[in-house]
Curated annotation (Swiss-Prot):
Expressed in organs that contain secretory epithelial glands. Highly expressed in pancreas, skin, kidney and testis. Weakly expressed in prostate, ovary, intestine and colon. Also expressed in placenta and lung and fetal lung and fetal kidney. GO terms for cellular component: extracellular exosome; Golgi apparatus; Golgi cisterna membrane; Golgi membrane; membrane; perinuclear region of cytoplasm. Gene3D superfamilies: 2.80.10.50, Spore Coat Polysaccharide Biosynthesis Protein SpsA, Chain A. Overexpressed in many differentiated carcinomas, suggesting that it may serve as a marker of tumor differentiation. Mn(2+) binds at residues 277, 279, 415. It is an enzyme of class 2 (transferase). The chain crosses the membrane at residues 20-37. This is Polypeptide N-acetylgalactosaminyltransferase 3. The gene is GALNT3. Disulfide bonds join 517-535, 561-574, 605-618.
Amino acid sequence: MAHLKRLVKLHIKRHYHKKFWKLGAVIFFFIIVLVLMQREVSVQYSKEESRMERNMKNKNKMLDLMLEAVNNIKDAMPKMQIGAPVRQNIDAGERPCLQGYYTAAELKPVLDRPPQDSNAPGASGKAFKTTNLSVEEQKEKERGEAKHCFNAFASDRISLHRDLGPDTRPPECIEQKFKRCPPLPTTSVIIVFHNEAWSTLLRTVHSVLYSSPAILLKEIILVDDASVDEYLHDKLDEYVKQFSIVKIVRQRERKGLITARLLGATVATAETLTFLDAHCECFYGWLEPLLARIAENYTAVVSPDIASIDLNTFEFNKPSPYGSNHNRGNFDWSLSFGWESLPDHEKQRRKDETYPIKTPTFAGGLFSISKEYFEYIGSYDEEMEIWGGENIEMSFRVWQCGGQLEIMPCSVVGHVFRSKSPHSFPKGTQVIARNQVRLAEVWMDEYKEIFYRRNTDAAKIVKQKAFGDLSKRFEIKHRLQCKNFTWYLNNIYPEVYVPDLNPVISGYIKSVGQPLCLDVGENNQGGKPLIMYTCHGLGGNQYFEYSAQHEIRHNIQKELCLHAAQGLVQLKACTYKGHKTVVTGEQIWEIQKDQLLYNPFLKMCLSANGEHPSLVSCNPSDPLQKWILSQND
């Protein structure tokens, strides 16, 4: 047994001895190879150093690949912790906005209106009638009316904080929601004043603060056009200190509305500009529809639906919940602004009260516009002076240069409409004619002659070339590639009657038998007889045209014609309006060689006998039936 164990041990010893020898031989052989390789590398290194560098680079690449592989393996393993998300940067100029609609809380006004006394003068927008006044009160009232051309006595007794009662706008206006995206732009409200009554100015300011969302109203800028009333200086400065967003800028000398508004626009910092007059009151939800429309259309110039505040009682004419027969702006050929009812095609285009109204012109006192677009489109004509014509000029320019004028019926702002201006013109009313000439020369092309025939002051300014430099305005017209006035008449205001560019005769109609001229009289909008009046050669009420249709037209503010009738001759709406209409017999006149004005329908002639011209049996020897039709000087 012991012998057997020794044999086993010997066998094992021999077996492992052979293994060790084999392993040793392999190791020895590997060492020899390494030595030889090292010697070879050393030789090569001494001769070719650049090859060594390439080898090192290859080794580095191999290491990089190995590390990348390790990282890939690591990333492929399940993660036990969640990392924070990486915030994505928003490109400069992009304004983030949330989806959905603004809430009532988001559109909360700047200030909450204080509690109201329902029995206070003018409360809820009601009329305040000033009757049974004492002698002193009556004198105060008369002084206020003379100074401001409205009842300042009543205004001073109405709270600066008065509300306007329930929101009476149509339901679609009250329920209208405004999208957060694109966001509603901010606005700077600009109010120009010159010797304005304290109560109307500050009621305007308070009204804006009580009805404008704080997130939209960036500032109220009061621009003082060199007021001389002391209460509008230090006292006003002190009063507005309580409102951080109200600021006052002042012009040391009176330069007028146009320059003052340009000053306000220069200092404004909001995305849009909203211009208001200094005797306004804003109704509920007035601002949002204006700004929403600009957010939708950068080129839209939008006005509120202007409600009337009675100049005597300060009653606010509130909107109807059933909607109303809206008006839009127009112009006449004396370049005065007016109102007219909507044509059928505009009524049919609008589906409800939230839809804007396209308007050929705008009143110009109350409107909102993108500040960037205001500057791009040419702001105001800086060479226009004081006031007058700037709204018609801007109306033509906006439409002809690619923008649009609109009225937003859900936006309601009240305005005190005065029958006359309380302010004087430093250079006289000639500045209005000069302003109008500037707009006519730039925007009306050959149609400007229609205006010049109706305004002798304007014609003289043109003749003397006293309208100033127009190069900047023409540069704007060229830069914006604006359309001509024919395009405007055909596409924007096709309803307007365009008088003959070259009428047979135009000017005054003078009696041979006495030194008097045919005159339409004051405020004759049709339906009244004409009068005979001293000839003045200034056009206006004594301007007439003998048309190619044989009418005698006085179409300045309205299309009015001499209308033959038994007895007194009247001024009535012209029956010929173009567009396949015809002239009725009562409005056809023939100028005969013997200077008679003959109506073939009644077979009678016009006579200057009496205060009012009339039709009589024709008598060529009667000097009162003879007329001179002549152009104004």
